[in-house]
Amino acid sequence: MKKSLIALAVFGAFTGAAMAQGSNVQLYGLIDAGVTHYTGLSNGAGGTTSSTGLSSGVQSGDRIGLKGTEDLGGGLNAIFDVETGFCGTGTSQDVATAGGTPQTYCTGGGFMQRQSWVGLAGNFGTVMAGRQYTAQFDNEAAMDPFGFGLNGNIGNLSMVKHYGSYRADQVLSYVTPNLSGFTGVAAYVFAAGKGTVPTATQPNVSRAWTLNGQYGNGPITAGLNYTDVSNATSATAGGVATGAVKSWQLYGAYNFGVAKVSGIYEQAKQDFYSGNEKNWMIGLTVPVGPGAILASYDENKNSLALNGTAAPSGDTAKQYAIGYTYSLSKQTDLYASYAHISNGSGTAFAVGSSTDSFSGVAGQSSSGMAIGMRHMF
């Protein structure tokens, strides 16, 4: 009790000082816990294994953050958002970075690394600078009935997960105002790789830019995205990266009232490689009482091959998913979900969740189920 009072006093002092300066600061977050069971996971020795546990962030990654605005006058506002992930069920969860390092914060990669940006908003639109979600991720999450969460999320097979492009560091972005339903996003990433300082082994800094256009009016949503990442691929397995990865997305949704149908198609090509990687998903959301039935079909096909080498075969994976969410209030819901992935002879995907991430085994199927609760504050 004493600790709670101290924490409230400290936060109260902080927000009080901010409010005194004309700012509006809000504390927000969510905590999500669910019982999960996964099969078809890699055991590290060419075989499969299973996992059962109490996972955090099944539907949405656990987080806590501060966001705020300051009225600068003349319709101009200063805005910011800093957000950190945390592991609501403990740090023993099977969550790791792309390099295999366990994540203490479960999502985001570090303290205040889910988001951390500052910007200006006005009649001209919004300009933001810092660590931000990518437009590619936003598009997938918006079209996915599972919202990039639960066992059936599009991220199990998507290129956003494959290329690790959920968020980006050192992003300068501009979002247009809504122009009769049309909105646009333009962003430049100063450090799409490890940093902006060239090294002996990587003298070329990887940078990226993206353009996104979307139309939304009533029941209709449709959009297109193009992204270019420089110095991301090399002509040999261990060579210096001088080639680009270029990708695009086409997406749309229509809400019929009794059901919402959504879909997305995305494709990526790499310099020094023939072929491409393609992913597409079609989803269905059906409101039922205070909840909704969720369903989707997702397919990933990868024909990328280093120039001069044979194109891969059997590189197609398919995912079938179904779920249900039940709202107890505007802030609290219950959920249940199930997903199954059929891997081709050259794919090794595994079912995960918003936070759980696993590797599968080529040619072996993977399944996952979850039941849990999410509370937002």
Protein language model features and the residues they cover:
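Detector for outer-membrane/organellar transmembrane beta-barrel domains
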Residues: 204-327, 338-340
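Structural signature of outer-membrane beta-barrel domains
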Residues: 34-38, 81, 85-89, 134-138, ...
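Transmembrane beta-strands of outer-membrane beta-barrel proteins
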Residues: 28-34, 81-83, 130-132, 185-189, ...
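Outer membrane beta-barrel
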Residues: 22-37, 51-191, 205, 214-221
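Outer-membrane beta-barrel "beta-signal"
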Residues: 364-377
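Outer-envelope beta-barrel architecture signal
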Residues: 4, 23-29, 70, 74-78, ...
